[in-house]
Amino acid sequence: MANRGHTQPRALAWALGLTLVWILLGACGGSRPLPALSRRHHRLAADLGTGQLHLAEMDTPEASGPGMVSEHCGKPSPGCESFLGHLQVALHNRFRLLLLGIRQAQPLCSELCDIWFATCESDITCGPTWLPLLEKRGCEPRCTTYEQTFADGADLCRSVLGYALPVAAPGADHCLNISISVLPGSRQERKAQEVTFPRSRRSRTWILDAPGSGSGSGSGSGP
């Protein structure tokens, strides 16, 4: 019991970090300029900066559309937009579970950063860093791609997410990953789920995107 009480503040701090990341993915993950965000998001950002959080501010529709790029830079690729959207939703769901004490804090797997970089390397990004959030700025005037801005996946995650969500070392045992199945159907029909694979000795949590009616479409090896 004492141990559970000791870990609760750390989980809450990590959940606040996830909240910041969730907002960043909606604000700049798709390169939407920060000034275009609603007043609610600016208030939530300020609350995070002072260590206060109003949960009622979280479910605002304005943050659900990553992939909004400045017109002169062109549209984002469907793959990158979809990946960022699922990552945003997954982190938001993770944030709720952390606040409830159902899940413990885990850093991102380095493989997730590599997939993010590979998926979005030709897409436009805001700049080398999206932090600090309270700084009023939009995307840089020139249209730079992920590949031009970041050296690799690790550089991407560290530059973009900073202290808000740490990245585990390659091959680390305890980390959070995301696996997105590119399946037909609208986004509303897809559901992000957290799946832990018990076979592996490594305690990795995978956020698997699959249809709600599916029963585990296999990316695992057969018997």
Curated annotation (Swiss-Prot):
GO terms for molecular function: riboflavin binding; riboflavin transmembrane transporter activity; signaling receptor activity. Disulfide bonds join C73-C143, C80-C120, C113-C157, C126-C139. The keyword Lipid biosynthesis does not apply. Keywords: Cell membrane, Disulfide bond, Extracellular matrix, Membrane, Secreted, Signal. It is a peripheral membrane protein. Its main location: secreted. Residues 1-30 form the signal peptide. Not N-glycosylated. It is found in: Secreted, Extracellular space, Extracellular matrix, Interphotoreceptor matrix; Cell membrane. InterPro entries: Folate_rcpt, Folate_rcpt-like. GO terms for cellular component: external side of plasma membrane; extracellular region; interphotoreceptor matrix. Riboflavin-binding protein which might have a role in retinal flavin transport. Belongs to the folate receptor family. This is Retbindin. It comes from Canis lupus familiaris. The gene is RTBDN.
